[in-house]
């Protein structure tokens, strides 16, 4: 297994790896993978109609908040919450300082990228449009950003795996009911 960057340096590579190397997307750990969920309730079972009532116990709000702050980072699972909160901050800083430029050698406004990431966090799991993100930044941060810039920055975030949008549900039925066709916007990790 080889792991690598979203912005690999292709200079000097004589072989693409075609037929030998498969690319796969690595995501942060789920609560089950980190040992913080029993896995008793399966999304697969729910989708297949096998729903059995289960007692999950009391859900502690503070514990849920801790899980969100800690995120799915493997290195964060055994650290203090204060240390765990520091890792995503440093990760975002490193991505904005280095990877954003390296992806295509284009200079971008780091401050506006930070504002857009904050706006995405405020609009997590919604079908917010680029124009609404622009308006959110203006309303909350009192900063102007062009809609085309929002679109370009969202593309960079997607290519750097900072976002992981959810495709809309597509029913294979003919119906008079209109289903929303926009992607739900998600950051790759809640932390």
Predicted regions and their residues:
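Accessory nucleic acid-recognition modules appended to NTPase machines
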Residues: 81-191
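Conserved Walker B catalytic segment
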Residues: 1
């Amino acid at each position: 297994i080889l792991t690598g960057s979203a912005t690999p340096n292709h200079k000097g590579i004589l072989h693409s790896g075609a037929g030998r190397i498969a690319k796969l997307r690595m995501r942060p750990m789920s609560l089950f993978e980190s040992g913080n969920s029993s896995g008793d309730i399966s999304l697969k079972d729910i989708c297949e109609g096998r729903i059995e009532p289960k007692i999950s116990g009391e859900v502690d709000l503070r514990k849920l908040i801790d899980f969100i702050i800690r995120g799915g980072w493997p290195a964060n699972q055994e650290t203090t919450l204060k240390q765990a909160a520091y890792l995503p901050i440093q990760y975002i800083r490193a991505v904005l300082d280095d990877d954003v430029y390296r992806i295509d050698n284009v200079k971008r406004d780091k401050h506006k990228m930070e504002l857009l990431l904050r706006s995405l966090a405020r609009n997590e799991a919604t079908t917010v449009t680029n124009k609404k993100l622009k308006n959110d930044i203006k309303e909350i941060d009192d900063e102007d950003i062009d809609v085309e810039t929002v679109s370009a920055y969202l593309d960079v975030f997607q290519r750097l795996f900072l976002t992981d949008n959810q495709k809309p549900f597509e029913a294979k039925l003919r119906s008079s009911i209109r289903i929303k066709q926009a992607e739900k916007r998600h950051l790759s990790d809640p932390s």
